[in-house]
Amino acid sequence: MSANEIGRRLAWALDPVSFAEDKLNFVADQWQRQLLRSRSPAIMLNCCRQSGKSTTAAIAALHSAIYDPGLTLCVSPSLRQSRELFAKVMLFLKSIEPVIPLEEDNKSSCELSNGSRIVSLPGDPDTRTSTRPSGSCV
C-alpha cells in the first residue's frame, strides 16, 4: 500500500466529509459538513423538508459504524421514518467499494464484519425497547 493510499484511508477515518466525498460520491452543503464534523453530544437542526437531514444522519451513522466500532443507534420520530433512515444507511453501505461484508442484515439493523451494529428505531417510547448505545448515537 502506497503512502498516498495510507493517507487517504486515514483521512476517511478522521474526516466524515472526506469519507462521504470519496467513498459515497456525496458533496455536502456547508451545514452538512459542520454536522458531519461536529463532536457535540447533541445537535439541534432547523432545516426545511427535503434538505438532507436523513441523508446526513445516514452518512454519520455509517461512518461511525465503520471507523468507531460499537453500537450506532438511529432514532427517528416514527417507525416509517426509522425504516427510511435505515434504508439510506444500507444504500450508502452497499455503494462502498470494496464491499463491506455484513454478519447480519434485516429491516431495522445490521452488523458489520468489524462487530459494529447499526440499529434504527422509532422514537416513540411505546414502541421502543430499552436499547442503549455503547458508542455513537445519531
Locate each region found by the language model:
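Phosphate/NTP-binding elements of NTP-utilizing enzymes
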Residues: 1-138
